[in-house]
Design a protein with these regions (language model features):
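Active-site/catalytic core of tyrosine-dependent DNA strand-transfer enzymes
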Residues: 86-140
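Short, charged phosphate-coordinating catalytic segments
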Residues: 38-61, 163
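A short, basic/aromatic helix-end/turn motif that makes direct DNA contacts
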Residues: 50-56, 166-172, 180-183
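Conserved tyrosine-mediated DNA breakage-rejoining catalytic core shared by Y-recombinases
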Residues: 50-91
Length: 206
């Protein structure tokens, strides 16, 4: 008896329209910047919550993930890495600092600005509370980790080599990346072959 392989559950990703709806539902620049970083870098929520101002190199348009302890318990699950970002994200960061962050004395990028204790590092719970509010506003029952899956999927479909994607995600090996996103290679190969008419009008009939 031949056992059929059970298909692995594929990671959920956000369509561009869904991501735009989430960003547009953010009423504060801090919140919009938080999700913009998730979407642009493919970082984990804990890695973004642990960002410090020194980790954002505005001139180079880079965000660095540094493994270390943070007061809010946020941490990087993998080794350090640097992720290139676009100028739009850097401009949003500058707007956030100018319009909302102001003169708050903190090393952390994401802090309490309206809730007490003001200036303290934003917590996982605070971020989750925001997710709940955005779910209610948008009708999208999303998880922040979907931003990570979306970034990886976008990179791979745009032709970025899996070795590079693995490094950007901070995976321990390419094998880890392949185990999660390897289905994209087969899916995209099928799409290309179908577009080329490979499965129709064959000279040899089975």
């Amino acid at each position: 008896m031949i056992a059929l392989k059970v298909p692995k559950k594929l990671p959920r990703i956000l369509a561009a329209s869904e991501m735009q709806a989430i960003l547009d539902a953010c009423t504060r620049l801090r919140d919009r910047f938080f999700f913009a970083v998730l979407h642009e870098t493919g970082c984990r929520a804990g890695e973004v919550l642990g960002l410090r101002h020194e980790d954002i190199a505005a001139a180079e348009s880079e965000v660095s993930i540094v493994p270390r302890e943070s007061a809010n318990g946020a941490r990087a699950k993998s080794g350090g890495r640097t992720v290139p970002v676009g100028p739009e994200l850097i401009r949003l960061y500058a707007d956030y600092l100018h319009e909302e962050y102001g003169g708050i004395d903190s090393d952390m990028v994401f802090v309490n600005l309206w809730a007490e204790p003001k200036g303290h590092a934003w917590t996982y719970q605070a971020a989750y509370d925001l997710v709940l509010r955005l779910r209610a506003r948008t009708g999208i029952d999303f998880d922040p980790h979907w931003c990570r899956h979306s970034a990886a999927t976008r990179w791979l479909r745009d032709g970025v080599r899996i070795e590079v994607v693995s490094a950007l995600l901070g995976h321990s090996s390419v094998a880890v990346t392949s185990s999660v996103y390897g289905h994209l290679t087969a899916e995209d190969a099928r799409a290309a072959l179908e577009k080329a008419g490979w499965f129709t009008g064959k000279e040899v009939q089975w």
